[in-house]
C-alpha cells in the first residue's frame, strides 16, 4: 500500500510500553525529529498531564501511536494495549491521530543508536523517534475519529 506524504503539521509520537512511554516530536515541516524524556506509565494515567504540557509547549497538532504488530501484521497483546491507550489519548486530547505499525522499532533503535540495557527510557524515546520518521516517510494521514484507525 502506498501513501502520500502527510500534510504539514507538528506531531507527537508515542512508543507505549507497559512501564514507560517514549516520546518524540517533529516540527511542522518534518525537518527535525526530537526526542523527549520518556514518561513512567502510571496506573491512574497521570502522565497525560505531562503529555498535554508537551503538546502546548511544542504547539503539536496531532499524534501517532506505535502498534507492535507481529511479523504477519496481526495484533499482539501489547498492540491491543497500545490501541486502547491511543484511543484513551484521543478522547483526552481531541487531536487527530493515527496508529503506525512499529514492528521491531526497539530492535532498530538498539542497533541504530547503540543503546543497550537502558532503564532510563532513552531507548523508548528513540523508538518513538523511529516510529515518527517511519510515519513521515510512509503515512498514513492522521484521522480525527477513533473508528478510522489505519495501519
From Swiss-Prot:
Coarse class of the protein's main subcellular location: cytoplasm
Gene Ontology terms, MF aspect: nuclease activity
SUPFAM superfamilies: Ribonuclease H-like
One Gene Ontology cellular component annotation held by this UniProt entry: cytosol
Pfam families documented for this protein: RuvX
Compartments where located: Cytoplasm
Keyword rRNA-binding: no
NCBIfam families: RNAse_H_YqgF
Protein's name in the database: Putative pre-16S rRNA nuclease
Organism: Prochlorococcus marinus subsp. pastoris (strain CCMP1986 / NIES-2087 / MED4)
Record lineage: Bacteria, Bacillati, Cyanobacteriota, Cyanophyceae, Synechococcales
Amino acid at each position: 500500500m502506498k501513501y502520500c506524504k502527510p500534510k504539514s503539521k507538528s506531531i507527537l509520537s508515542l512508543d507505549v510500553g507497559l512501564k514507560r512511554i517514549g516520546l518524540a516530536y517533529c516540527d511542522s515541516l518534518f525537518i527535525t525529529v526530537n526526542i523527549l524524556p520518556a514518561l513512567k506509565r502510571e496506573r491512574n494515567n497521570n502522565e497525560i498531564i505531562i503529555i498535554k504540557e508537551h503538546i502546548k509547549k511544542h504547539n503539536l497538532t496531532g499524534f501517532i501511536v506505535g502498534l507492535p504488530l507481529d511479523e504477519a501484521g496481526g495484533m499482539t497483546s501489547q498492540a491491543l494495549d497500545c490501541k486502547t491507550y491511543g484511543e484513551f489519548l484521543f478522547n483526552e486530547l481531541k487531536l487527530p491521530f493515527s496508529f503506525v505499525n512499529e514492528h521491531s522499532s526497539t530492535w532498530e533503535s538498539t542497533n541504530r543508536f547503540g543503546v543497550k540495557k537502558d532503564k532510563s527510557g532513552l531507548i523508548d524515546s528513540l523508538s518513538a523517534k523511529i516510529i515518527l520518521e517511519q510515519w513521515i516517510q510512509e503515512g498514513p494521514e492522521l484521522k480525527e475519529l477513533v473508528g478510522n484507525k489505519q495501519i
